[in-house]
């Protein structure tokens, strides 16, 4: 992808805002643009299975991180131990799926994982998740049961909401 999506506000490297209405509006717009570019860069099964995208805004740095469903399957993916655990500690993801999707498959997990690997703290993160299917492109998509278990009460905000159980 040729465009830069690193910061929420282009041309203002490191600009930070705490205004939730601004974050929500700008995040969603950037996410839609990123998702279109990402879709255009994918082929085969990766393209046909891409149905969800997430942007994570770190309010402490102004940086953005993007994720897609199935992103953890990409080559070179580094699983953050806070999420996935390690040899000595369990991660905060559920041990087994709370729905029909594999634990760690979600766009939210992909984006948050990237943010954590860059040094972000969960308490500073704002999440926005959208559908990227032709039928519902750009519409908000509530975070699933696995993500609700993992992130609700730990992240600053989720503009797409949480699935109802």
Role assignments for model-derived ranges:
Residues 4-165:
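Zinc-dependent deaminase catalytic domain
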């Amino acid at each position: 992808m040729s465009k830069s999506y690193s910061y929420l506000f282009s041309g203002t490297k490191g600009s930070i805002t705490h205004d939730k209405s601004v974050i929500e509006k700008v995040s969603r717009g950037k996410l839609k643009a990123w998702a279109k570019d990402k879709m255009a860069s994918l082929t085969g099964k990766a393209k046909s299975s891409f149905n969800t995208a997430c942007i994570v805004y770190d309010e402490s740095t102004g940086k953005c991180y993007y994720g897609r469903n199935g992103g953890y399957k990409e080559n070179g993916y580094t699983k953050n131990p806070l999420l996935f655990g390690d040899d000595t500690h369990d991660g905060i993801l559920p041990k087994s799926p709370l729905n029909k999707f594999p634990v760690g498959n979600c766009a939210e997990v992909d984006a948050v994982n990237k943010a954590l690997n860059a040094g972000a703290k969960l308490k500073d993160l704002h999440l926005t998740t959208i559908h990227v299917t032709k039928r519902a492109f750009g519409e908000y998509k509530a975070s699933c049961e696995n993500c609700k278990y993992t992130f609700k009460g730990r992240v600053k905000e989720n503009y797409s909401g949480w699935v109802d159980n």
